[in-house]
């Protein structure tokens, strides 16, 4: 049977042109009043998926 793409991963992770995986950082959605502004600034922007997780994420995306 054909493997299906994991729809949760599909929504959260984007593949760059060079093949790296980009994801948004956690802890910046809600309850931001209690968090220091330095922390929320640091959590801005995307970060890459760790090397340990890339194989698993690629499999969930249906690649390899």
Swiss-Prot record:
On whether Ribonucleoprotein is a keyword of this UniProt record, the answer is yes
Basic and acidic residues bias located where?
Answer: 21-33
Q: Which UniProt keywords apply?
A: Ribonucleoprotein, Ribosomal protein
Q: Where is this region: Disordered?
A: 1-64
Spell out the InterPro entries in the cross-references.
Ribosomal_bL35, Ribosomal_bL35-like, Ribosomal_bL35_CS, Ribosomal_bL35_sf
Give yes or no: UniProt keyword Signal: no
A cellular-component GO term for this protein: cytosolic large ribosomal subunit
Instruction: Tell me the domain of life.
Output: Bacteria
Which residue stretches does the UniProt record annotate as biased composition, category Basic residues?
Answer: 1-17
Q: Name one GO molecular function term.
A: structural constituent of ribosome
A Pfam family:
Ribosomal_L35p
Read off the SUPFAM superfamilies from this record: L35p-like
Give the UniProt record's GO annotations in the biological process aspect.
Answer: translation
Among Gene3D superfamilies, the record links this protein to: 4.10.410.60
UniProt record similarity statement: Belongs to the bacterial ribosomal protein bL35 family.
Q: Which PANTHER family match?
A: 54S RIBOSOMAL PROTEIN BL35M, LARGE RIBOSOMAL SUBUNIT PROTEIN BL35M
Q: Which HAMAP family match?
A: Ribosomal_bL35
The protein depicted here goes by the name Large ribosomal subunit protein bL35
- From which source organism is this entry? Corynebacterium kroppenstedtii (strain DSM 44385 / JCM 11950 / CIP 105744 / CCUG 35717)
What is the name of the gene encoding this protein?
rpmI
């Amino acid at each position: 049977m054909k493997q299906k793409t994991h729809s949760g991963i599909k929504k959260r992770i984007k593949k760059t042109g060079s093949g790296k995986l980009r994801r948004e950082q956690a802890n910046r959605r809600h309850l931001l009043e209690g968090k220091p502004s330095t922390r929320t600034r640091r959590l801005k922007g995307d970060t890459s998926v760790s090397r340990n997780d890339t194989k698993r994420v690629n499999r969930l995306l249906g690649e390899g």
